Amino acid sequence: MKVLILGGFLGSGKTTLLLQLARYLVDSSGSGSAYKVVILENEVGREGIDDKLLRGNGFDVENLFNGCACCTLAGELVSAAYEIEKQYTPDWLIVETTGLAYPGLIQDNLAAGIGMESRVCTVVDVSRWKRLLNAMRELFV
C-alpha cells in the first residue's frame, strides 16, 4: 500500500486536491486497471464535513476525530492505517491532515509504529503565501 499524507493550512485546497487525485487514481491508472483508494480524514472536531463529500463521491473513508494525528491521536493513526491495510487492502491510502498538523510527524509515526513508508504533499494557497511565510516562518523548512 502506498501512503500519501496531504498537509496544509485550513482553506489551502487539501480536500479539492485529494478529490481530484483520488478520482484520477481510480479512473485512469494508466495501465487500464483502476487503483483502489482509501482516504483517512483527520478532523480536530467531533464531526467531519469533508468525509461526507468524499463518501458522496464514492470513496471509502475512515475518520480520526477530536484531535490531531501528529500528536494527540498518533496511536490511533497508526492503528487506523494498519486496520485499513488489513480490511480494505488498498493500493493507495491518502491521509488528509488537519490544518494544524505537522505532516512530517505523521510520516514519522507511521514509520516508527508499523514500518509504513509514506510521502508528504503540502498544499499552499499561493494568494496567502507571503502572509503565511511572514507569520509562521518557523514552521517552514
Where do the model's predicted regions map?
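Nucleotide-state-sensitive switch-loop elements of NTP-binding domains
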Residues: 2-7, 12, 16-139
